[in-house]
């Protein structure tokens, strides 16, 4: 099993400013791939891409617009540079390592990895026939595609819930989108979660979902989020109420309940 902190959070990868091709070559000899290079010129950007290193293009106001960079930081002034968290995440994405999303008192939420698959398969197997649970993890190829396509494009999705103390995978939770049959609400952020049966009843879902709501407001700057559940799912309905989500009228043919939360955390 993947250690709960493997590849996330504490990489301490430096961000190194370079302005010329020659300077880049000197820095590369020292740091190699174990750095993120902060570049504001096209020539060194092309060199670092050829070398296979991670880089962020610093786009100054009224400066050169670069379409070749994987990551662009739009500077508001000369002091506006990427912070350590952004630098670590650029490097982790470049190295195909999972992002640490957030921590709580007992949990870590991180991007999923292939080593999580056996746990996911067991969790979804337990829920076959449950109308509230969409079977989202049937095999290796499905999870591999999700990791490769979802996280880089959206920077959110379903994440893995891990016990901070032991590294045990408790379930999945995160943010996706309401489906097309929700009319004008289609595509709106949806809070989703699935906890393994043996781990239920200990507050894991509430703790994880509270952290996700806070992350959605603070980091993703979302204004509202929805949660769907069937009328028969008493536990999900109670959780929605505990999270402060308000029930709104169902608009689908499936007769499910829809809850909405306004994300108004103070900054």
Region locations from a protein language model:
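Conserved acetyl-CoA-binding loop-helix of GNAT-fold acetyltransferases
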Residues: 201-218, 234-242
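Positions that flank functional sites
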Residues: 63-64, 232, 255
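GNAT-family acyltransferases
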Residues: 4, 32, 73-198, 214-215, ...
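Conserved beta-strand-loop-alpha-helix junction that forms the acyl-donor binding cleft
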Residues: 40-42, 227-237
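Nucleotide-sugar donor-binding loop of glycosyltransferases
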Residues: 59, 231, 251
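Alpha-helical elements of the RecA-like P-loop NTPase motor core of helicases
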Residues: 45-46, 118, 237-238
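Asp-based, Mg2+/Mn2+-dependent phosphohydrolase catalytic module
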Residues: 1-102
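Conserved acetyl-CoA-binding loop of GNAT-fold acetyltransferases
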Residues: 51-55, 241-251
